[in-house]
Amino acid sequence: HVIPPAVAKAGMDTGAARRPIIDMEGYIQSLKARMDPTAAIMQGIHARARQAQARMIFAEGDEPRVLRAAVAWQRGGMGQALVVGREAEVRDQLEAAGMGDALREITVVNAANSRHLETYHEFLYSRLQRRGVDREDVLKLANRDRHVFAALMLAHGHGDGLVTGATRKNAPVLAQLGQVFDLRPQ
């Protein structure tokens, strides 16, 4: 994807080109789309994501891969990255990955300090009380399980999307999410 645009630019610079390319970036994107059909699909997805400016919740804030994804989301102009975790741990992981400056860009959400925690507890208790879960268990679940806390954020509109499951297999994560959302098809 580098050589054809360079040839076109050289042709314009030397006067050999019949028509100048006004939008070089658009020309490069159209070449990529012709050479790789999946690139066109991904470009459309990225364009829609940038336009929507979604608040994406990243549940596993102590995982380096997740933090890199959150920073890429934020820096890529996709929207706001909300990372669930303890600020000190997130800072240490970012510094270890060489991205210490990214802490100013992302938003770290700690379950223990959330002002919405009481609302989350009441919501989760209303869902789980008939399954034999008492209030104390609900408090522990919402405070300690980052997947459940992130799902509660999403359920209450404090985020637009959720990225989770990087450190566990799908089934246990879906089981945790099932405590907040109805996962069965209607």
Sequence positions of predicted segments:
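Anion-binding alpha/beta catalytic cores of soluble intermediary-metabolism enzymes, centered on
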Residues: 18-21, 25, 29-186
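Adenosine-phosphate binding glycine-rich loop
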Residues: 1-17
